[in-house]
Structure formats: C-alpha cells, structure tokens
UniProtKB/Swiss-Prot annotation:
Keywords attached to this entry: Ribonucleoprotein, Ribosomal protein
Gene: rpmG
Segments traversing the membrane: none
One Pfam family cited in the UniProt record for this chain: Ribosomal_L33
Name this polypeptide is given: Large ribosomal subunit protein bL33
Similarity annotation: Belongs to the bacterial ribosomal protein bL33 family.
Alphabetized InterPro entries for the sequence: Ribosomal_bL33, Ribosomal_bL33_CS, Ribosomal_bL33_sf, Ribosomal_zn-bd
SUPFAM superfamilies assigned to the protein according to its UniProt record, in alphabetical order: Zn-binding ribosomal proteins
GO biological process: translation
Keyword Ribonucleoprotein set for record: yes
GO molecular function, one term: structural constituent of ribosome
Organism: Rickettsia typhi (strain ATCC VR-144 / Wilmington)
GO cellular component entries: cytoplasm; large ribosomal subunit
Amino acid sequence: MAKKNKNVLVRLVSTAGTGVFWVKKRNPKTQTEKLSFRKYDKVVRKHVIFKEEKIK
C-alpha cells in the first residue's frame, strides 16, 4: 500500500483583487507559517504578492 500524503493543497490568491490564484502543496509540519509569493498576475500584467488561503 502507498503511504498517505502529508502535504495539503493551498490556494495562493492575488492581493491585487483580480481573483487570479495559484495552487501549491505545502507540508504543515515543516512550514507552519502561511505562504506568500511574489508571482505574475496576468490580469493586471504585473508581479504582485499572492497570499495563502484554504481551498474550499
């Protein structure tokens, strides 16, 4: 049998308010703080901060 995966999927939502998001995996045991990345938002055509939200 395969091992159970401990990673959880999180949704990184743009702070520009455009509704653009990226989905990433994160291990809650090793990464306890919330993720935030500076990634490209294709709606505003700029790099903006994306912050973590739970996937509903």
